């Protein structure tokens, strides 16, 4: 079995685990969002009793459901090329994570780097760059 085919299969099912993990984070009031006044704000028990973005649900939708749909639509296309889902996963997950980090409190012990980037954002930037490098490799290989 080819390595990138196996990685593609793993990439296509990983969003299911990410979705379930983020739902568990929401239920357990973990990784809470930033304080907010939007109508769908949530007050989590055993926190500071302030209304917050349900950032775990944003992540469940983007990194879980949306990414799952994108990857599986690509994987089951007639002209699917091995490796495509691998780099799309890295680019997609990284991008969706960067977006969702704007609504999420940074880890208390880490805070922000350069007063703007959370650790999640920083790592996601590297993930997107890695995905783009792999995409360039596959593009050169198939052209």
Question: Could you say what each language-model-derived stretch is?
Answer:
Residues 1-143:
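A feature for loop-to-transmembrane-helix boundaries and adjacent hydrophobic helices
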């Amino acid at each position: 079995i080819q390595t990138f085919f196996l990685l593609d299969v793993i990439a296509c099912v990983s969003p299911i685990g990410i979705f379930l993990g983020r739902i568990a984070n929401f239920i357990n009031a973990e990784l809470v969002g930033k304080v907010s006044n939007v109508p769908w704000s949530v007050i989590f028990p055993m926190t500071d009793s302030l209304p917050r973005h349900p950032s775990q649900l944003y992540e469940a939708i983007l990194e879980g459901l949306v990414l799952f749909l994108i990857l599986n639509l690509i994987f089951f296309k007639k002209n699917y090329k091995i490796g495509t889902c691998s780099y799309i996963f890295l680019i997609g997950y990284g991008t969706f994570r960067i977006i969702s980090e704007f609504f999420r409190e940074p880890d208390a012990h880490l805070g922000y780097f350069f007063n703007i980037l959370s650790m999640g954002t920083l790592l996601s930037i590297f993930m997107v760059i890695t995905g783009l490098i792999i995409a360039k490799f596959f593009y050169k290989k198939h052209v």
